[in-house]
Amino acid sequence: LIKQPWQGSCEHRSEPARHSTLAGIALFAKERAMTENALIEAARVSKAWPFREAQKLLKRYPQGKPGGAPVLFETGYGPSGLPHIGTFQEVLRTTLVRRAYEALTGGAPTRLVAFSDDMDGLRKVPDNIPNAELLSANLGKPLSRIPDPFGTHESFAHHNNAMLREFLDRFGFEYEFVSASDRYNSGGFDAALTRVLECNQAILDVMLPTLREERRKTYSPVLPVSPTSGVVLQVPVEVLDPATGMIRFTDEDGTVIEQTAFGGMSKLQWKVDWAMRWYALGVDYEMCGKDLTDSVTQSGKIVQVLGGRRPEGLIYELFLDENGEKISKSKGNGLTIEQWLTYGTEESLGFYLFREPKSAKQLHVGVIPKAVDEYWQFHGNLAGQALDKQLGNPVWHLLRANGGDAGAGDTVPVTFSLLLNLIGVLGADATAEQVWSYLGNYVADASPEAHPALADMVRAALATNRDFIAPTLQRRAPTPSEAKALKDLDNQLATLAADPTAEELQNIVYEIGKNEAYGFETLRDWFKALYETLLGSPQGPRMGSFIALYGVPETRKLIAEALES
């Protein structure tokens, strides 16, 4: 990894067939260059947020990073818990900026480091962890020096780091994993620690004014590891010799200890640690949540004290629950990534996380259906869009996130919302086989093999219906005027030729709703009546599409049941 030069003071540092083939190759190269140039020009003025972020890096290095070095992107992970949707969000969004920068620069080299803060001392026992007493007995120790309560890895941190890597690999992210413990223990951070010790007082001058009076008495940029208990200590530290790393502090039992801060015998306070990492690794870009706004400010000052440069970055808003309250692990009011992937699709998750990172988002099951449908709507629009519009299309960015190219604008033949309405009629015990038999009314070659994306939507829709929709559906009896309109609809469906189109069916429904004899003040009232009497829901799909999918005979049975009620 990139390291900075060190200094001893705390000052700032800143044939015909052959000819034909060659001509063809030259023409292809020219066309490719023209396409690439057009992309670069469009990217330079794009207002899509990944390009806005990438443009910051272009200003940082107008001629590219010195020496042709790759621009370094970083994401952080605290391994006191398992990877979660926030972890995915940060790696995905950082990757989107990375790919935008590559497009903006015509392929400038980049790297993404996934950094694990596994030297942190364990402050409390996480929920839902086996062998909690094992963790309780090791509170305060670095996460990488605590036994694994799952019994599968060298330490608790090793277990969670493995989960992180498996998690990131599952989604195809391109990254390099770096462990804080490995860096501290191997001496990989010793040079950076030397610099911190040299600048100890200057760092205190940054941090002390931000602390309460009581905290100032014990605050030290360096946190020694007790030689007796192995706990990361929060005690005052006297720097004796930055070159050798020698420090003096009082241990938990009152013994005055002199030991080196190097080789894993200490770690740094959070804000100092973040700044040191930026400095040591040469980080150019890192984003974080709104809750770390002050950390960005103070760590930015500290990295400048060390002689480094604060990275570019984005401060994003945090998730809210369906009531607009902050999501809390202790409350359990959030949505896990496993839950999203049960009731939605991977593409829809990426799409939802792409949109407006600086705006607070509600995160609950109710937002998933719209995200699924909007993803495919944007996907279908992509091929027909001009280049500047493509760069503003979330799907363009998502398809390129892991090295792919923007797709050909394909889409799915049925919306997720329509699937939910179909399955809602079939009931809580609906099966995939049933759904595919109905899809045969609407989709050519209706099979999971021919339509894998649709198959994933069917899976998610079945789970959503089973757990959330079916228990709430309740059809009501139609009013007398609604019953007359339903009877008219049934009569017209009975006279239709085989295989009517969704549009033909929609026109029939539409004309009945406009018939003043049935007394609907607006078409919305008629559609609402259809949803409530036939589907058991206050809202629903375009009825023409639903009838085409469900089938005319089956729809007539629904009408008959409603009229009988």
Question: What role is predicted for each listed range?
Answer:
Residues 173-331, 337:
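Active-site cores that bind ATP or allylic diphosphates and position pyrophosphate for catalysis
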Residues 104-108, 163-176:
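A structural motif corresponding to the C-terminal end of an alpha-helix
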Residues 291-296, 317-463, 535-565:
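Catalytic adenosine-cofactor/nucleotide-binding cores of aminoacyl-tRNA synthetases and other
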Residues 35-127, 273-295:
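N-terminal catalytic cores of NTP/NDP-binding nucleotidyl/phosphoryl-transfer enzymes
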Residues 119-136, 192-193, 197, 326, ...:
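Charged, often glycine-rich, active-site loop that binds/positions anionic groups
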